UniProtKB/Swiss-Prot annotation:
The record marks E113 as: Plays an important role in the conformation switch to the active conformation. A motif ('Ionic lock' involved in activated form stabilization) lies at residues 134-136. It comes from Zeus faber. Belongs to the G-protein coupled receptor 1 family. Opsin subfamily. The modification N6-(retinylidene)lysine is found at K296. One of its GO terms (biological process) is G protein-coupled opsin signaling pathway. Disulfide bonds join C110-C187. Keywords: Cell projection, Chromophore, Disulfide bond, G-protein coupled receptor, Glycoprotein, Lipoprotein, Membrane, Palmitate, Phosphoprotein, Photoreceptor protein, Receptor, Retinal protein, Sensory transduction, Transducer, Transmembrane, Transmembrane helix, Vision. This is Rhodopsin. InterPro entries: GPCR_opsins (IPR050125), GPCR_Rhodpsn (IPR000276), GPCR_Rhodpsn_7TM (IPR017452), Opsin (IPR001760), Retinal_BS (IPR027430), Rhodopsin (IPR000732), Rhodopsin_N (IPR019477). It is found in: Membrane; Cell projection, Cilium, Photoreceptor outer segment. Photoreceptor required for image-forming vision at low light intensity. While most salt water fish species use retinal as chromophore, most freshwater fish use 3-dehydroretinal, or a mixture of retinal and 3-dehydroretinal. Light-induced isomerization of 11-cis to all-trans retinal triggers a conformational change that activates signaling via G-proteins. Subsequent receptor phosphorylation mediates displacement of the bound G-protein alpha subunit by arrestin and terminates signaling. Glycans are attached at N2, N15. GO terms for cellular component: membrane; photoreceptor disc membrane; plasma membrane.
Amino acid sequence: MNGTEGPDFYVPMVNTTGIVRSPYDYPQYYLVNPAAFSMLAAYMFFLILVGFPVNFLTLYVTMEHKKLRTPLNYILLNLAVANLFMVIGGFTTTMYTSMHGYFVLGRTGCNLEGFFATLGGEIALWSLVVLAVERWVVVCKPISNFRFGENHAVMGVSFTWLMACACSVPPLFGWSRYIPEGMQCSCGIDYYTRAPGYNNESFVIYMFVCHFSIPLTIIFFCYGRLLCAVKDAAAAQQESETTQRAEREVSRMVVIMVIGFLICWLPYASVAWFIFTHQGSEFGPVFMTIPAFFAKSSAIYNPMIYICMNKQFRHCMITTLCCGKNPFEEEEGASTTASKTEASSVSSSHVSPA
């Protein structure tokens, strides 16, 4: 084994010199330069500084403007709530521990940080799945005359919480566990050991199949079908400029959605799977730290991709920030009108760019 395993931790360094200590009790400055911990703390501060206002503003603007309280926006609000869970329950803890150079909050703090980070990430992931399914059902119409209503939105939100808890709760009760990872300042699922009594192997396989591979497959399938439907509609109305514009808008949205998901989560999932399947191989603390901390940036990407690209929401947000007036009223109004025209045109071919 190319690491040191303790009762509730795994440090990626062989303890041949006797310097390895528990990440709950001692600074881990022997792993990397102490300046690296300061950089992590600064990075987490940046995510908090940006992530909290953006996601809180999403909730506040939606509550202030009744026209934004649509069934589909329930899912988008759920996404913002998930991001706030990550910011408040995970990012603040990680920033604090990074400032100290070890997981100063102890085993209980590790469980809480790992739980909130996993819960928030999974709620966000399954919210994206619900959005993908909603777009596929409404746009491609595999079910005739289906209308996405408030009841469907509530069921979708409940589903995201159910699936998120199915992934984040078991490690609290003995099916796998949360341990410090990377530079030992943040906690995650134990991919590193086969500790007796925790059944890490079965949980990691369950998590990768049910909470990564399946959601990714659903997202690709739904948005793939959506893109095909938009292209078919555009081909049938090649002389319609509004339809062509709608095709470009939907294509851009789909590409950004898929790329954003992959950029945030694929590096972390790939490294975690590599560590799980190559237990005993040599790897440094930075090997897991970089993708783990990069995945946390999804709390910023999500609202920008799924909320700020919505013209109506952007108009309401500017109105709120500017004390009830939108200084870009004419430009935003023209843009919103064009968007509505595109939606109406493409709707006649059973496609909507929203």
